[in-house]
Amino acid sequence: MTGIFCIFMWYLLLILYMGQIKGVFGTYEPITYKTGCSLWGIFFIISGISIIRATWYPSQRQLTCAMLENILCMILAIISMILTIVELSTFKSVSYRNYGQAKLGRQISRVLLSFYPLEVSMALTYSIFGCVGLCRKKEDARTADTEEVEDAF
């Protein structure tokens, strides 16, 4: 759900920044918009799909893929947080015509900054439970092998 929210916020920023007028001081083009940080929400959607798939069809491969995708999502969310903090800490002057759009864009970045820790915590939680699931699968396989060997004697 947070991935979809981030993608919609990026779309709002796209519409907002496309309407800028080239002024004396130029247009406002933040680093998070150029890198498409909000578009990285697609990775959170893909990760959620893999978690659902691993729940429906549990296997070691599915759990490993879901866990690796969650780790990737954590890394991307941390990078997004850092880029957003850098964007919000610096503000170059823009044309007075674009000031309102730049101000609104910075407010959207502040909203997104509050969602990135949520994404990190959700991905971390799912990664921890994925590790627990993998450990249980390995323990169940070991006990099943031990029982088969004991039954053979």
UniProtKB/Swiss-Prot annotation:
GO terms for cellular component: plasma membrane
Keyword Transmembrane helix assigned: yes
Cystine residue pairs: none
Localization annotation: Membrane
Keyword Transmembrane helix: yes
GO BP, one annotated term: cell surface receptor signaling pathway
Keywords associated with the record: Membrane, Receptor, Transmembrane, Transmembrane helix
Membrane topology field: Multi-pass membrane protein
Residue spans crossing the bilayer: 1-21, 36-56, 71-91, 111-131
Function: May be involved in signal transduction as a component of a multimeric receptor complex.
Family the UniProt entry places it in: Belongs to the MS4A family.
Name of this protein: Membrane-spanning 4-domains subfamily A member 13
Species for this entry: Bos taurus
Lineage: Eukaryota, Metazoa, Chordata, Craniata, Vertebrata
